[in-house]
């Protein structure tokens, strides 16, 4: 069965219940949340996340697997600022606790940026951070995200992610989140040779570690190292390639999460997810979908 959903908001008093309601309104059977704003460390206590009602609503609507995304501000690849590194370590620990409390198994993490020290130094720092964070008894896997390679990001090559995984002691607690936009922007030809890219991933990392897919089109050409998401079918990856990935027989069990941009003028922009999910379920591109989203 196809597991497809999107990023949804966990906010207000309903929190997880609100997130589940939003996902259901899009026709989703999985979803991804941040436990608070992605750009800061302000978080409500676990008891205010409305977990029981949220889980009950999920069960009622056949949602059994969800994903949590760690905030962008975590950077355990920072070799120059000890405070940034230690904040990343402590906050990642608390995010694991929150993810476990919510009942999710995958916590997506941007591996980190080396801020000028070089990829090797960044990778060593990320390994150090993950070794500090991970415990043998945690239920959650940290899903390292494939990155576009903009700025000083680590993790845009499969070899870099493999090196991180190999360096972590309890690496059974690590998985990978494959982002289509990022991987395309990093230079992998997922448009014309997705099977070849998947084989390369399997050879270098292992397909058994691929636990989350971020399904995004890209505003930029392959190898641009930009990381700007586009709506499904309107970018350089295109509908056919993304549809092929979403329905790939080797990836049917993996939750697919859309993180595409809202459509329309900023103040009144509308989420595209209901329409994009429907297109991908039907395996049929609608060139007029953006007009329908803003109607």
Swiss-Prot record:
Stored HAMAP family: Nfo
The EC number(s) this enzyme carries: 3.1.21.2
Residue positions binding Zn(2+) 2: 145, 179, 214, 259
GO molecular function: deoxyribonuclease IV (phage-T4-induced) activity; DNA binding; DNA-(apurinic or apyrimidinic site) endonuclease activity; phosphoric diester hydrolase activity; zinc ion binding
Keywords noted in UniProt: DNA damage, DNA repair, Endonuclease, Hydrolase, Metal-binding, Nuclease, Zinc
Disulfide linkage: none
Pfam families: AP_endonuc_2 (PF01261)
Stated name of the protein: Probable endonuclease 4
Cofactors that this protein relies on: Zn(2+)
Keyword DNA repair carried by entry: yes
Cofactor binding summary note: Binds 3 Zn(2+) ions.
Residues at which Zn(2+) 1 binds: 69, 110, 145
SMART domains per the UniProt record, alphabetical: AP2Ec
Binding, Zn(2+) 3: 182, 227, 229
Function statement: Endonuclease IV plays a role in DNA repair. It cleaves phosphodiester bonds at apurinic or apyrimidinic (AP) sites, generating a 3'-hydroxyl group and a 5'-terminal sugar phosphate.
Example of a GO biological process term: base-excision repair
């Amino acid at each position: 069965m196809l597991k497809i959903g999107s990023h949804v908001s966990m906010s207000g008093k309903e929190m997880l219940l609100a997130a589940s309601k939003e996902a259901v309104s899009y026709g989703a059977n999985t979803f991804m949340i941040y436990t608070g704003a992605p750009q800061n460390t302000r978080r409500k206590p676990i008891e205010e996340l409305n977990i029981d009602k949220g889980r009950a609503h999920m069960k009622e609507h056949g949602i059994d697997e969800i994903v949590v995304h760690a905030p962008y501000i975590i950077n355990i690849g920072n070799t120059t600022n000890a405070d940034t590194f230690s904040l990343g370590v402590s906050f990642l620990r608390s995010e694991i606790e929150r993810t476990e409390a919510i009942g999710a198994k995958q916590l997506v993490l941007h591996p980190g940026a080396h801020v000028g020290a070089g990829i090797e130094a960044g990778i060593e720092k990320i390994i150090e951070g993950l070794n500090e964070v991970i415990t043998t008894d945690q239920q959650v896997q940290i899903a390292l995200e494939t990155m576009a390679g903009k700025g000083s990001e680590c993790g845009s090559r499969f070899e870099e992610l493999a090196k991180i995984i190999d360096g972590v002691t309890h690496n059974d607690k690590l998985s990978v989140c494959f982002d289509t936009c990022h991987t395309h922007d990093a230079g992998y030809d997922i448009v014309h040779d997705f099977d070849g890219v998947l084989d390369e991933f399997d050879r270098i990392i292992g397909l058994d570690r691929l636990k989350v897919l971020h399904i995004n089109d890209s505003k930029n050409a392959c190898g641009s190292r930009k990381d700007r998401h586009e709506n499904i079918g309107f970018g350089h990856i295109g509908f056919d390639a993304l549809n092929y990935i979403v329905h790939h027989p080797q990836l049917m069990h993996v939750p697919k999460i859309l993180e595409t941009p809202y459509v329309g003028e900023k103040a009144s922009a509308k989420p595209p997810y209901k329409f994009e999910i429907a297109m991908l379920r039907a395996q049929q591109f609608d060139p007029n979908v953006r007009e329908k989203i803003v109607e």
